[in-house]
Amino acid sequence: QGLTTPYTVAVDINGNEQNGTGILALSTFGPITAGAGYFNNQNINTNITNANFNPGLLGSVVRYSAGSLGLTGGEDLYVATVQGDLDFVKLESWYLGMQDTFNSYTLAATGKIDIAENAKIGLEARYVNLKLDNELASDDDRKNSMFRLAVDGKVSIVNARLAYTQTGKHGGLTAVDQDAKNASLGWFLTSNGVPDAKYWQAALGADILDNLNFTLNYGNLKTDLNNSPVEFKNQEVYGQLTYKMSKNLTTYLRYGTYEQKVESSGVKQTDNTRGRIQVAYTF
């Protein structure tokens, strides 16, 4: 069964999914939805080291830390949620606990505002707190957190988004998949697992046709890994042309640049240019 939580991705078009053996049940009472779940095994151990894929030295440091959790896939997993739909705003609270590994909670509020017939704005505020078990880390090193504020909108054919994410100074591991809601993801960049990160994301695009859109994306992530002598500055710019052929068939062309620099020395650790074409059909 797929693990449908803001920490995980239950269904992924590229096959990188989290699932387990167990049950997750939800019940709705008017505007309130409550649920709980238990899984006696899962495949989080195969995904956690890829939960951060930042290139260069920064990514190597973060992935090493995630790999040191020593997961086997046999750990028990506990899930609970309470959600409220108040029409103008949706509220979510989640708990996720893994046996002898971590305990975490998420608080989120999202809303949609129709300001005109062809103008809509979306808002999000999200906070995640994850604390590692005593056996895995000590004192402040156990603490991981992030908060994100985001606004997106579409006016006629123009779409835009602006988001700011900041992770805790001791740790930023708040999801077990880089595509999960509890991680802020660009293309080359992700906040997940990065301590003391300050991450800005911006996007501006337009519909060329009803089913053809071009969007330019920008990302800037800075961190000194909690006052270490090394301060990283990461920046990416990429454009994406998306063509939705049908309800189930989508293709995109993406091209952009990524740069990682050590601020103290001015040395570029990474300077990449890359492109990607993807054609995907969902059933």
Role assignments for model-derived ranges:
Residues Q1-A10, A34-G37, A80, F88-Q99, ...:
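Transmembrane beta-strand segments that form the barrel wall of outer-membrane beta-barrel proteins
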Residues Q1-N54, V82-V89, G153-H170:
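Outer membrane beta-barrel
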Residues T4-A10, Q42-T46, G97-N103, I115, ...:
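Gram-negative outer-membrane beta-barrel proteins
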Residues E17-T21, T28-G30, G74-Y78, D85-D87, ...:
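Residues that define the transmembrane beta-barrel architecture of outer-membrane proteins
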Residues I23-A25, A34, A80-V82, L91-S93, ...:
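Membrane-embedded beta-strands of outer-membrane beta-barrel proteins
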Residues T28-P31, Q83-F88, G97, I113-E117, ...:
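Outer-membrane beta-barrel strand-turn architecture
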Residues A80, A202, Y243-M245, D271-F283:
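Outer-membrane beta-barrel "beta-signal"
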Residues D85, T110-D224:
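Detector for outer-membrane/organellar transmembrane beta-barrel domains
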